Curated annotation (Swiss-Prot):
Gene: dscC
CDD domains: Ubl_ubiquitin_like (cd17039)
A single cellular component GO annotation: Dsc E3 ubiquitin ligase complex
Organism whose genome encodes this protein: Aspergillus fumigatus (strain ATCC MYA-4609 / CBS 101355 / FGSC A1100 / Af293)
Keyword Transmembrane helix recorded: yes
Subunit details: Component of the DSC E3 ubiquitin ligase complex composed of dscA, dscB, dscC and dscD.
Domain of life, source organism: Eukaryota
Protein name per its UniProtKB record: DSC E3 ubiquitin ligase complex subunit C
Pathway connected to this protein: Protein modification; protein ubiquitination
Region (Disordered): 88-110, 148-177
């Protein structure tokens, strides 16, 4: 019997793993007589390989139809070896068994050899005609060795297609917008507006720069101002986002504190605040300085009302 190339014994396959060929008898649902098949390597031949072998024995008008193999009432999976699908016993039990009889004992004859029983595989021929691509995919998983080779080829191609690791650092902050189609002038204008917002709640000596500014921009872009209001745990070091939303929304507590304490200081200690601001420029943020000025105005208004009355 002639076997296709993918079912012929492979030179790299260890023949000791099986005790002999697997004897099968294929029984069809259509009016086609049964025929025997001998599978040399059932440990590496899959159900798809058996289908390929069966197609060589079918009439030309049925060789491309969809086949379904059934054994013991259960369908065989295409990618599973026959030794697993058919639940074959270990290889020594598939070899011919020598039975002793009286002639052997007397030395007057040879022991008869019990032939290995054949397994019946039911083959259902469907009405759907497979395309060339489907037949090629079926042939690609005819043996487990072909599957392993295909997996190795796919892994090798995937490694070749992967770009080499870049040595340049990824852009951070608003620089990420350059890859999204923004021009450098637009990114610079956006950064200027962002710095103007930060100057409302920060003094000049606490304005973020460098990596701190990039981290602040990343957080603003990724999480929004509500995440900035959550702040960064820790002591005096790190970045605080409590006052970075301009005093509105979830982070307005810092803005309210600035306005309240600034107004109280301007109302009860106007002269001291004026001297302090004169000697140390930039000691308060713009928001706190405005609150101090409002407190001073309220103090003057109360004083004028008291004098007039």
């Amino acid at each position: 019997m002639t076997f296709p190339a993918f079912l012929s014994p492979d030179p790299t396959w260890d023949g000791d793993s099986t005790g002999g060929p697997l004897l099968l008898t294929v029984r069809f649902s259509a009016s086609i007589p049964d025929f025997p098949l001998d599978i040399e390597n059932p440990d590496i031949t899959t159900a798809a390989g058996l289908k390929q072998l069966i197609r060589t024995h079918l009439p030309p008008n049925l060789s491309s139809h969809r086949l379904r193999l059934i054994y013991a009432g259960r369908g065989l999976e295409d990618a599973t070896p026959l030794s697993v699908s058919l639940k074959l016993p270990p290889s020594p039990s598939r070899t011919p068994v020598v039975q002793e009889d009286a002639t052997t004992v007397k030395g007057k004859g040879k022991a008869p050899i019990r032939e290995q029983p054949r397994l019946y595989i039911h083959c259902s021929i469907g009405d759907i005609v497979l395309s060339d691509a489907d037949l090629a995919a079926e042939a690609a998983i005819a043996t487990t060795l072909q599957q392993e080779q295909a997996d190795e080829d796919y892994t090798g191609r995937k490694k070749q297609q992967q770009p080499p690791p870049s040595t340049t650092s990824a852009p951070r902050g608003f620089d990420r917008l350059l890859s999204a189609g923004f021009t450098p002038s637009e990114v610079s204008a956006l950064r200027s507006q962002f710095m103007a917002i930060q100057s409302v709640s920060r003094t000049p000596d606490t304005m973020p720069t460098g990596a701190e500014l990039r981290e602040l921009e990343d957080r603003w872009m990724d999480e929004g101002s509500s995440a900035m209001a959550a702040g960064v745990p820790g002591g005096g070091e790190g970045i605080s986002f409590a006052d970075d939303d301009g005093g509105f929304g979830a982070g307005s507590r810092g803005a309210m504190d600035d306005m309240l304490w600034g107004a109280v200081m301007g109302f009860f200690w106007p002269v001291g605040c004026a001297m302090w601001l004169r000697r140390e420029e930039g000691v308060w943020s713009w928001r706190k300085g405005l609150a101090v000025f409002v407190g001073v105005v309220i103090n003057v208004a109360f004083g004028a009302m008291r004098i007039m009355n």
